[in-house]
Amino acid sequence: MLFAMMLTLAVTAAGQDPKPTPQKLFESGKYQEAIDSVRERPDAPEDQVYLRALAHRKLNQNDEAKQAFGSLAGAPEGSAWRMIGNSGNALVDGNLDAAQEAANHAVEADGGSAQARYQLGLVESARNNQPQAAAAFAKAAELDPQMAYAHYEAGMAYYKAKRVDKMAVYFENFLKLASAAPERPAVLSIMKTVRGK
């Protein structure tokens, strides 16, 4: 009897989905839930604070985004996170020159940071420098292959730069990584149009 109860509990526990990560919440368009999940942790790592800032931007909550970017900007002098925060705040303010300078410094400080490359891509995209944006997002995706939105943004930038060969690769990766993303229908439509099917 005891064995049967333990087996039932084990099967029930195994069948339950673990609490989704802030990244998975973000990738499924649950931006407020992603924000709340990060806020629950006062010691949240910088990559999650950055994700929180991006989620605020998706919800057009620019003041809250600036708070999150501001906490990153409080990182030690010379760190990539400090520059990412500064770039994010400048981008929210529409100061593209300052955003570009800070993003470039973030990449110089830590060229292996997917988030630094992603931030650079956001700035290049805002400046309508699509080939440079595509290269930055593609590098972010290379550095962190699980970063779904790096694939999405690379695909969009390649699409705008009329490089549909590269666009398709990044969009396919995005669709695999973020199957519940709100951008999924638009990506599928673009892929269908480009492929003529």
Outline where the language-model segments fall:
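Start-of-helix register in tetratricopeptide repeats
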Residues: 47-50, 81, 115, 149, ...
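N-terminal leader/linker segments that initiate helical-solenoid repeat arrays
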Residues: 7-51, 58-60
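Canonical tetratricopeptide repeat
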Residues: 51, 85-86, 119, 153, ...
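Structural signature of tandem alpha-helical TPR/SEL1-like repeats
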Residues: 32-33, 59-68, 92-105, 127-139, ...
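Short coil loop/turn residues that delineate tetratricopeptide repeat
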Residues: 40-47, 77-78, 112, 146, ...
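Conserved structural position within tetratricopeptide repeats
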Residues: 40-43, 70-74, 104-108, 138-142, ...
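Residue-level recognition of tetratricopeptide repeat
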Residues: 23, 54, 88-89, 122, ...
